[in-house]
Amino acid sequence: MRVLLVEPNYKNKYPPMGLMKISTYHKILGDEVRFVKGFDNSVDDEVWDRIYITTLFTFDFDLDIETINHYKFLVNDINDLYIGGIMASLMPENIVKVAGIERSHILTGLFTDTSVVGDDNDINVDELP
């Protein structure tokens, strides 16, 4: 499986912990994983089996929605696009309304059960390094 991890173009020093744990999870499964920040045109001509996009602060809502709308067309099936992070946990219904993503594809809280992304294993992603 080809997995793309996306962080909107925030001004920060460290990569998002949640996406890094998801990276570890997919590498354990033997998947190809790529991380990008902001709008990375180098991945625009590729089709991805699964895309995860993180969100951070609520004041970055517009940037997050722009990022979601940019990358949602690069996933093989829109049902394999997942949005998570702090803002997604606080404002899931706003993302549903504005970006047209199904509520079940907005990951809120901890990522302890991989069945929420359609996987069937006992790995607790939040416990991974």
Please place each PLM-identified region on the residue numbering:
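N-terminal [4Fe-4S]-dependent radical SAM core
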Residues: 1, 92-129
